[in-house]
Amino acid sequence: MSAKEKFTSISPAEFFKRNPELAGFSNPARAMYQALRELVENALDATDVHEILPSIKVIIERTSQEKEIYRLTVEDNGIGIPPHVVPDAFGRVLYSSKYVLRQTRGMYGLGVKAAVLYSQMYQDKPIEITTAPLNSKRIYSFKLKIDVTKNEPIIYERGSVNNDTGYHGTSVSMYILGDWMRAKSRVYEYIKRTYIITPYAEFYFKDPEGNVVLYPRLTNKMPVPPKEVKPHPYGVDIELLKNMISRQKEDTTVKEFLVKEFQSVGEKTALSVIEMAGLDPDKRVQKLTDDQLSKLVDAMKNFPDFRPPSPEALSTIGADLIELGLKQTFNPEYVGAVTRRPKAYQGHPFIVEVGLAYGGDIQPSEEPTVLRYANKIPLIYDEKSDVVWKVVEEIDWKRYGIEDEQLPLVVMVHLCSTKVPYKSAGKESIADVEEIEKEIRNGIMEASRSLKTFMTEKRKEEEARKRLLTYLKYIPELARSLSIFVTDGKKELAPKVQEEIQNKMIDLVVTKLNIKDKDLELFKSYRVETL
Ligand SMILES: Nc1ncnc2c1ncn2[C@@H]1O[C@H](COP(=O)(O)OP(=O)(O)OP(=O)(O)O)[C@@H](O)[C@H]1O
C-alpha cells in the first residue's frame, strides 16, 4: 500500500464538467429545461434591464432520430454582445457582465457555459451565436466550444455581415442531449411562469412536436430598471476591501477611499467609522496593515448609523403588473398584490413582493399553488426546500377567511436583491436567511389581509343571498293564496292568475338582487311541500 496522494488542480470548466448537477444539469430532462432557462434569462437581462420591451423567440427541434439530440434556439431583441467578448462570454466559465451590484437574473457567470459543457459531452456540434450590439453596422456570428482543461473558448468559425436594417439582439443555438417527454411539463410551466412575471414581454415558443404557442405582450409598462450601486459598508469583508484598495491611486487616503467607494458614507460618517477603528483618516489606504484592515472591517460592520443599502439597485415588478399577470393566467375571482418596503441583509438591499389569487379558474388542491420568483426568475424545482415554502406552510389560511378543505389559492412571492441566497448554482431554491424569511412572512400576511376583507364581503353576500332564496321559496305558496283571493275562488281562473303573480314576484326579486341563472334554477327546484 502506498501512502502517497497525487495532487493536481483542475480548471473551473473541468470542475463543472465533472459536476454538472451543481449547475442543474443532472439528467437529460432537467438539462433541457436548465439550458432553455439559461438562454431565456440572458435574453431577458439583455432587454428589460436596458428598457427594451422584450420579444423572445424559443425554438426546440429534434435533430437526430438515433439519439435524443435537440437544437435549442433562443432569439432576443436585446442590447447584443460586443464581438470581442463573445468568445469569453460563451466559452470561459466565470466570465460575466453581471459581477456588479445591480439586480439581474444572471449572477454567477456560469449559466450558459454550464449548458455548453453539458452540450459538448454528448454530441459534437459547437454553440452558434449571432449578435449585433445596439447601433452596430455589422452582425457577427461565432461557432465555439470550451477547452475544458484550459477554461478557454475554442473558436470554430467567426464572421460578420452588413447590418442594413438596424437590427440589434442575439440569437443562440445549441445542441443538447435531452428528454422532451420528461421535460415538457416543466418547460411549459417555466415559460408560463416567466410570462406571469414579465407581462410586458412577448414570447413565441415552438416545441419539438411542432406546437407553436404565442404569449402576447399584455402591457407596454415596464418596471423601473435597476441602477448599478457601490457596495454598502455592512457587506464588506477583508478580501473585498483588499481587492478594492488594490485598484486605488497611491495617494488615496483612508477617508477618501470610504467616501468615494461606498454608498451611505459621507465625510462625517467616514470620520466616525475611522475613529471607531482607531485609524488615521489621512493615512494612505494602500499602507494599511492586515491588522488595521481587520479593524476597519469590524468598524464598518458595527457602525450603527449607516443609512440602509440603496434600493436603487433593485427592480421590482409592482403590484399592478403582478395582478395583471395573475389575472391573465388564472382568471381568478380575487387578485391582490403588495410590494413591501426595502430591507437589507448582509449589506444587500432586498424587496419582497407578494401576489395572491383566489377562486375563479384556479384548480383547488390541498395546498396552495406557490409561485416562487427571485429577481424575476421563476423557480420550479426543489419547492419544498425553499424558504418561501417554509413560510407558506405555516400560514393558517382559516384566519384569513379561507375555510375550504381544497384551496383554490395561488400564492406568488418575488424576492428582489443584489444577492439572492440561492442554495445552488442551479438557482432553484432560496436559503432561509432570517431577515428574508421574516419579510416574506410579513408580505404574505399583508397581502392576506386584503384577501380576508374580500372573503368577509363574499361570505356576507352569500349569506344574504341564501336568506333571500329562502324567502323566494315562499313565493309559489303566496301566489297561490293570492290568486284564490283575487279570483274570488273561481277555480278555472286561479292557475293563470297564480302564474302571473308568481312571475311578477320572481322578476321583482331577481332584478333587485341581481340573481344569476344558476341561482334561479336552484330556486325553481324548491317545492312548497319541502319547506
Ligand atoms: N442574449 C444575450 N444578450 C446579451 N448578453 C448576453 C446574452 N447571453 C449572454 N450574454 C452575456 O454573457 C455573459 C455570460 O452569461 P452566463 O449565462 O454564462 O452568465 P450570467 O448570466 O452572467 O450569470 P449566471 O451564471 O448567474 O446565469 C452575461 O453576463 C452577458 O453579459
From Swiss-Prot:
> What's a BP term from Gene Ontology annotated to this protein?
DNA topological change
Database matches in Gene3D superfamilies:
1.10.8.50, 3.30.230.10, Histidine kinase-like ATPase, C-terminal domain
Quote the record's binding site residues for ATP: N42, D76, S97, K98, G106, M107, Y108, G109, L110, G111, V112, K113, K427
Name of the protein described by the UniProt record: Type 2 DNA topoisomerase 6 subunit B
Whom does it interact with, and what assembly results? Homodimer. Heterotetramer of two Top6A and two Top6B chains.
Q: What are the alphabetically sorted keywords of the record?
A: ATP-binding, DNA-binding, Isomerase, Nucleotide-binding, Topoisomerase
Supply the source organism for this entry.
Metallosphaera sedula (strain ATCC 51363 / DSM 5348 / JCM 9185 / NBRC 15509 / TH2)
Task: Please give the SUPFAM superfamilies that the UniProt record associates with this protein.
Answer: ATPase domain of HSP90 chaperone/DNA topoisomerase II/histidine kinase (SSF55874), Ribosomal protein S5 domain 2-like (SSF54211), S13-like H2TH domain (SSF46946)
Which domain of life does the UniProt lineage start with? Archaea
Pfam families listed in its UniProt record: HATPase_c, Topo-VIb_trans
- GO molecular-function annotation terms? ATP binding; DNA binding; DNA topoisomerase type II (double strand cut, ATP-hydrolyzing) activity
Q: Which reaction does it catalyse?
A: ATP-dependent breakage, passage and rejoining of double-stranded DNA
Name the protein family: Belongs to the TOP6B family.
Q: What does this protein do?
A: Relaxes both positive and negative superturns and exhibits a strong decatenase activity.
Which CDD domains does this UniProt record tie to the protein? TopoIIB_Trans
Entry EC number(s) = 5.6.2.2
